[in-house]
Amino acid sequence: QRQMCIRDRAYITETRELDKKFYVLSGNDSLILPALKEGGVGGIAGCSNVYPHVLSSIYNLFKEGKLEEAEAAQDSIASFRAVFKYGNPNTVVKKAVAMLGYPVGDCRRPFNYLCDEGVEALAKVLKENADKGMN
C-alpha cells in the first residue's frame, strides 16, 4: 500500500478513475467531506478522539445523502481546530481529552506544551461545543 499527500482534490477523482483499487482517506479532519465528495472513502480523524459522534456522522450523513447535515457536522469542528494555532494539534487533542475527564497523558517532548492562552481557548471551545450538544 502507498500513502501520499494530495492537495488537489481533482487528482482524487482522476486517480480513482484510473485505478479502482486506489482508495483515498482524508488525513485532514477539515477535508473529510470534500474528499468524500470527490470519491474518497473516509478519513483518519484525530478530532474523533474529542468528537467521535460528530466526525463519524460526517461519513454516515454523506452516505445517507444528507449533504446539508454532513456540511453542518463538518463545519462544527472548525472552532475546535482553530485552537490548533496555539500548539501542536496532537497536544491540543490530548489536552482536550484530558479536560473531558480522560487522563491520557501528555504528548512527548517537544510537543507536550500548550500555552495558558491555548488552554483557556480550548476550555471555552469545549464548553461552547458541549452546550451545542457536540460529542
Residue ranges of model-derived segments:
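Short beta->alpha connector loops
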Residues: 7, 29-30
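Short beta-strand/loop segments at the ligand-binding rim of alpha/beta enzyme cores
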Residues: 15-25
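Structured C-terminal cap/extension of enzyme domains
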Residues: 18, 30-135
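Active-site-adjacent beta->alpha loops and helix N-cap segments on the catalytic face
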Residues: 7-14
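Short, small-residue-biased leader/transition segments that mark boundaries at the very start
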Residues: 1-6
